[in-house]
Amino acid sequence: MPKRTLEDTELNPRDNYIKVSSKKSRKEKREKKSKDAEEPATDSTPIDIEVESKEARRERKRLKKAKRAQEAEEEQLPEGNAIESTSDADAAACIKAAKKAEKARLKALKKEGKEEKVDIPESTDSATPISVAPQQNGTTYTEDYNLSGLPQSEIDSFLTTNFITITDPLSASAALRPLIKFDYLPITDSAQRAPFKDFKAPTPIQAAAWPFLLAGRDVIGVAETGSGKTMAFAVPCVRYMSSLPKNQKNKGPRAVVVSPTRELAMQSYEQIVKLAKASGLECVCVYGGVPKDEQIRALKTADIVVATPGRLNDLINQGCADLSKARYVVLDEADRMLDKGFEEEIRKIINTTPSLGKRQTLMFTATWPESVRELASTFMTSPVKIAIGDNPTGDLRANSRIVQKVEVVEPRDKEYRLMQLLKQYQSGSQKDDRILVFCLYKKEATRVEGFIRQKGFRVAGIHGDLSQEQRTRSLEAFKSGNTPVLVATDVAARGLDIPAVKLVINCTFPLTVEDYVHRIGRTGRAGKDGLAITLFTEHDKAQSGALINVLKAANQPVPDELLKFGTTVKKKAHDAYGAFFKNVDTTKKATKITFD
């Protein structure tokens, strides 16, 4: 094929004219079509006409596309669902029939033992929607369907009857209902439900706290001694641990419970173990007075740690206890631990756990003083405060089910009067009734124990001079009833759950009225009535004013002999630092002062 030359490729004037003319004709045709579709304004320029024609084409394409989509949708619809063939009355009837069929299906599933959570539209006020709590700490709580169906009046009656006050800073969770029956607990394992078989219903603190704890919220529980606080935090703890993957179990503490005394730590441990074993969880109790080696070995595989603040802090400092993965932290009897001067140890322990927002922190206390409030504001995130009883402020108040009797006697007559009381309440059908006798000092407890034993009574003792093995043996003998009389110092006055204590005798009044309230709290537990008799002497007159206030607050009689000592209430003295103690934040550093 011959090559084309430049002359061949160049257009002559005629060819160029034909090409331009053809372009103009095509442009005129497009303009004519656009005029037929939409007549442009008389003053429009050629450029405006071209733009308008493009917009018209786009609009026509859009309308055609919408029409095709509508036709395709109408072809897919069945005749019964055609809008043109269904009147308003027919539509309402269809919706009603669908609701009825859905209810019947759910009822059949329930009979077969299946469970399905669905949202059914309801127009009546009888049904309450299932509320789901906010998620925190990786846990989720869904309210039981039967609990949601209860009328609100029944829930309000339960809260009012049991004097339950719930303060939630997050209004979104205020609708969580108390678990007034064990059936409403989200626990399907029969082994985990076994500890509740001897109880009719949860205690008020358990019923009110469980939904918030199961939802992963931080909770402050203010309730009197013997109200079931241990199981209140134990059940959510075990459920949280059970929800963890298997590869995260038995590889170090994921939950920690801090208690003020060895006895209380052991008591909490015994309750938690009952639930933990059913879920294959390891639990260890860490306290002082025994060798550390066995505790250190157990900590390596323990899932739940129950400990006293002193021993746990020692193990942390030695690098033997790692709480960096403990996302469930419980401070039991927080007010008592602060009174004993454990605030610094508590702060160090919590600082070794995950940060705020990554852990769930619980605080249970019998009172709500300023020191406990400051601690809660430091280590808790939007906590829900649950107060049980007619004392929502958490001020010091004795159990209203305990009958309090105060006898003013001469100091030299105390032992004689003590023997009269033991003979009165340890005779006949009351021979095996448990009586708890409190003394102020360890030497006094040893002397009173020997005096009672010489008079022929079965008695045991528990105080700081005894070894841990001796204290445990005495406590077990008293719980079993083999030794019906127990002489103790204030080491046993707080938190110990000793069932069926009929009588508490204060042979010597304690140093503070707070200790008095916790002493007598060993009786009248678990909803039962109790009796407390106090031998008051002139040596105790400094506490007369505070004692009178406690008696009046509980509607108990105040003897005239006690009123003679006066009603003045002295400033509370700190257990460790005396009356001139100043409560300061020990975590803050001092300001450096320079002199010119």
UniProtKB/Swiss-Prot annotation:
Residue ranges occupied by any Helicase ATP-binding domain in the UniProt entry: 210-386
Motif (Q motif): 180-207
Sequence positions that bind ATP: 223-230
GO cellular component, one term: nucleolus
Biased composition (Polar residues): 123-139
EC category: hydrolase
GO molecular function, one term: mRNA binding
Record Gene3D superfamilies: P-loop containing nucleotide triphosphate hydrolases
GO biological process, one term: rRNA processing
Keywords, sorted A to Z: ATP-binding, Coiled coil, Helicase, Hydrolase, Nucleotide-binding, Nucleus, Ribosome biogenesis, RNA-binding, rRNA processing
Short motif DEAD box, span: 332-335
EC number: 3.6.4.13
Region (Disordered): 1-87, 115-139
Positions with biased composition (Basic residues): 21-30
Compartment list: Nucleus, Nucleolus
Bias type Basic and acidic residues, positions: 1-17
Catalyzed reactions per annotation: ATP + H2O = ADP + phosphate + H(+)
Pfam (any one): DEAD
InterPro entries reported in the protein's UniProt record: DEAD/DEAH_box_helicase_dom, Helicase_ATP-bd, Helicase_C-like, P-loop_NTPase, RNA-helicase_DEAD-box_CS
Domain Helicase C-terminal: 417-566
Sections of the chain in a coiled coil: 47-120
SMART domains: DEXDc, HELICc
Domain remark in the UniProt entry: The Q motif is unique to and characteristic of the DEAD box family of RNA helicases and controls ATP binding and hydrolysis.
Protein function: ATP-dependent RNA helicase required for 60S ribosomal subunit synthesis. Involved in efficient pre-rRNA processing, predominantly at site A3, which is necessary for the normal formation of 25S and 5.8S rRNAs.
Similarity comment: family membership: Belongs to the DEAD box helicase family. DDX5/DBP2 subfamily.
Name under which the protein is recorded: ATP-dependent RNA helicase dbp3
Native species: Sclerotinia sclerotiorum (strain ATCC 18683 / 1980 / Ss-1) (White mold)
Gene name of this polypeptide: dbp3
